[in-house]
């Protein structure tokens, strides 16, 4: 392994990697911290896996946690301005005080970035920042509201240097451009309105900025809770259909292409629903290129159809209550 231009030997003994560094004490210190941290984390995982059979392992786990806590903090206090200190702050786990024992996850979510030196641009040369962001946004923010996520983003951006801010913004752009949870489209809109439309960001050209703003403007009209855009199309039987004329407790907008295998499967399901449910009306809209004479490109743009099938669920007032189901 080549680390900071120094020679590193990767040796294996009994299945455990032992790393030796030649020519640099500082680099050696990094690997020592990494090795001790990884070893103790693996030990805790092993102890946790046996808790069902050995409940007393909980005391060993607490002991290892305390050891790592003291070990990491001693490095930070001894070398506060070093990159080793930054490295330790990024690999150490956020710990909730004992008084927050019953609400530790809430504490961690609210203090996750407090101790991170997000003005140290050297961190961009590693995966440490990405790893930290992955854990926070993929785990802790997974079930949070868009409003809460936006609050955390604003705090994170405010705390970061310009270089780290640029990296974080593109990371968030990638994550929320087409989010798994449709409600998080509000997060993308927030990113555009507050950052991508206003700031000078690395690699953000005028053309890219315009396209990003355009997509946010489309999304803000079709987020959950908004009224569906007006829809006119010609169905497979040559009949003109208007969404405004449809009266039902629930309305499914099913955008599909005939050569899409998942569309074929889903269309059978929705055809069955249409026949068996009196309170559900299904509008199946063929958006294939061959059908553009019956379905305008405006529909594809208005409803932000990037993949097929795309599905919207409306209530009796034509309000969007779910998307991408």
Where are these predicted regions, by residue range?
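A non-transmembrane, solvent-exposed segment enriched in polar/low-complexity residues
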Residues: 1-80, 90-91, 97-115
């Amino acid at each position: 392994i080549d680390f900071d231009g120094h020679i590193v030997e990767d040796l294996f003994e009994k299945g455990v990697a032992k790393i030796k560094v030649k020519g640099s004490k500082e680099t050696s210190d990094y690997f020592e911290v990494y090795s001790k941290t990884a070893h103790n984390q693996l030990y805790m995982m092993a102890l946790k896996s046996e808790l069902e059979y050995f409940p007393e392992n909980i005391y060993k786990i607490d002991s290892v946690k305390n050891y790592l806590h003291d070990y990491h903090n001693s490095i930070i206090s001894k070398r506060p301005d070093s990159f080793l200190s930054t490295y330790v702050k990024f690999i150490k786990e956020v710990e909730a005080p004992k008084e927050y024992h019953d609400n530790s996850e809430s504490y961690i979510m609210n203090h996750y970035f407090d101790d991170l030196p997000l003005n140290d641009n050297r961190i961009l040369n590693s995966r440490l920042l990405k790893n930290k962001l992955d854990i926070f946004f993929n785990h802790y923010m997974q079930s949070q509201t868009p409003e809460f996520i936006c609050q955390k983003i604003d705090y994170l951006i405010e705390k970061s240097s310009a270089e780290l801010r640029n990296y974080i913004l593109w990371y968030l752009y990638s994550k929320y451009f087409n989010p798994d949870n449709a409600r998080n489209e509000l997060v993308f809109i927030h990113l555009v309105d507050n950052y991508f439309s206003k700031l000078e960001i690395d690699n953000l050209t005028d053309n890219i900025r315009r396209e990003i703003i355009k997509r946010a403007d489309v999304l803000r009209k079709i987020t959950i809770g908004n009224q569906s855009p007006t829809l006119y199309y010609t169905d497979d039987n040559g009949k003109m259909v208007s969404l405004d004329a449809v009266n039902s407790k629930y309305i499914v907008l099913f955008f599909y292409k005939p050569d899409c295998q998942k569309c074929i499967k889903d269309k059978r399901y929705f055809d069955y629903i249409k026949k068996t449910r009196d309170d559900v009306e299904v509008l199946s809209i063929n958006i294939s290129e061959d059908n553009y004479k019956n379905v305008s490109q405006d529909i594809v743009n208005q409803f932000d159809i990037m993949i097929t099938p795309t599905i919207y669920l409306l209530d009796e007032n034509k309000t969007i209550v779910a998307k991408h189901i």
